[in-house]
Amino acid sequence: MCGIVGYIGQLDAKEILLKGLEKLEYRGYDSAGIAVANEDGVHVFKEKGRIADLRAAVDANVKSQAGIGHTRWATHGEPSRLNAHPHQSASGRFTLVHNGVIENYVQLTREYLHDVTLKSDTDTEVVVQVIEQFVNNGLDTEEAFRQTLMLLKGSYAIALFDHENKETIYVAKNKSPLLVGLGDNFNVVASDAMAMLQVTNEYVELMDKEMVIVTDKKVVIKNLDGELMSRASYIAELDASDIEKGTYPHYMLKEIDEQPLVMRKIIQTYQDENGKLSIPGDISNAVAEADRVYIIACGTSYHAGLVGKQFIETWAKVPAEVHVASEFSYNMPLLSEKPLFIFISQSGETADSRAVLVQVKKLGHKALTLTNVPGSTLSREADYTLLLNAGPEIAVASTKAYTAQIAVLAILAAVTAESRGKELGFDLVKELGIIGNAMEALCDQKDEMEMIAREYLTVTRNAFFIGRGLDYFVCLEGSLKLKEISYIQAEGFAGGELKHGTIALIEDGTPVIALATQEHVNLSIRGNVKEVTARGANPCVISLKGLEEADDRFVLPEVHPELAPLVSVIPLQLIAYYAALHRGCDVDKPRNLAKSVTVE
């Protein structure tokens, strides 16, 4: 949600900011703006809409070597040019961009801004106005910035520009990601590494409640007590080409096609020199010794967690629960004596999940994070981390991260089962290899998936997904993909729940996509298909080879049934993609959605 870019150096800041913001589009936004400084003053450009709209509004003749930029996802105040960042102080001396939520902005307004008329509806403007009030009362900019930060309650990543000192950008963070990229006679600030790869791949991570003074020659990190902090730098394991679409029309399609490669990479990552699956011993021991596992996640990661729970309970024989992070924070269940918490987050920055992590760490419990981003907040704050190694996922709708999460959870469960002396009953390495081949075969059948999307989903307003057992969990993910990018009201249901209310929604022509990959419930789901067909539904059955029937719309390659979610989801991803495409929707950047949800 939202994104920040800042630059100070010798190059054209305007172009670096715009290109950086383009790399942050995947995070979700509804407006954008930049502020650049030169000898003529500070020039602010803001627009509601896409970065392309902002680029068109920027004066191409303005040259600058310093500036800050922002993509906004509205939390306080409607999406508009007025509420877009950057925001300026009353005198125009200070310009500021901010990600996060300032929870006490109303109180700050009452206490410090009696004589200031706010121009926007945002919490952000309050921050820059308070900074100016402190400067008006005699403090220098750095001290005014520090004093203001000490007043703030909530989450923030902030970049501040003082027009009387155009050689410095002031930066701070708390509960919202922010990096400082290091260069030769320049430095950059960004919400994530993708925005800075155009100029550097070396960066330092900021910790909560730290402030930074950034010039073209130096980066000075301090805590809010004013004490200097030392920090090692990292090299981003990304190349600029990793975040390009290449020949693909959309990132989502590219990322769907990358799933076979990701599967093979995961197998290689978690194999030892003898070809045996392996994870660090302290992690498998932590799971094996737990009396209950609590999986915490949101959205797609939650759906992956539902599948992972089955692996952990069925293979490792460890009781497991799956909880939506935002609900767990406020309704924590009665915990077991020796729990292990597993947090699943593609970005590693999900605010709801982090809030739970903070809670359980205070209680003294151990936590494991599954994430795609090394060095992310969740990976730093958890006791253990398992990386997905899926590569950058740019499209807002997650695809390859979902299957990577399931694969890593399967490996975790299998290794834990072995450490507990439990027999898996099959060779997981071999079966995951078969999965990779099946994924490849499915990705080669896009024409068939497009035909299904046209036939069932081009004009409908509603769609239902039904399944039983593991298929039900995949139906939840399939329905989420469809609603995310096509805006069709799609819902996933357990087949057995149809008769308890849902079947009342079935009418002539209602699309019902049914998964049939589990032999022990095959007759039951077939009965559910007959139920909805009798009431006028238009059924689309996707079955596993060996379980197919004559009227099935599509048959999946044969794979181990317990791993079927890794392949059955791919047709659902492709069907959602083509449904959105033919309905004229923005596939990679659906309305109102953010890739990385960094506010609660």
Curated annotation (Swiss-Prot):
Gene Ontology CC annotations of this record: cytosol
SUPFAM superfamilies referenced in this protein's UniProt entry, alphabetically: N-terminal nucleophile aminohydrolases (Ntn hydrolases), SIS domain
Catalytic residues in the record: 2, 595
CDD domains: GFAT (cd00714), SIS_GlmS_GlmD_1 (cd05008), SIS_GlmS_GlmD_2 (cd05009)
Domain Glutamine amidotransferase type-2: 2-217
UniProt-recorded name of the protein: Glutamine--fructose-6-phosphate aminotransferase [isomerizing]
HAMAP family xref list: GlmS
Domain of life: Bacteria
Subcellular location: Cytoplasm
Chief localization: cytoplasm
Key words, A-Z: Aminotransferase, Cytoplasm, Glutamine amidotransferase, Repeat, Transferase
EC number(s) given by UniProt: 2.6.1.16
Domain SIS: 283-422, 452-590
Function: Catalyzes the first step in hexosamine metabolism, converting fructose-6P into glucosamine-6P using glutamine as a nitrogen source.
MF (Gene Ontology): carbohydrate derivative binding; glutamine-fructose-6-phosphate transaminase (isomerizing) activity
Biological process (GO), any one: carbohydrate metabolic process
Assembly and interaction partners: Homodimer.
Catalytic activity: D-fructose 6-phosphate + L-glutamine = D-glucosamine 6-phosphate + L-glutamate
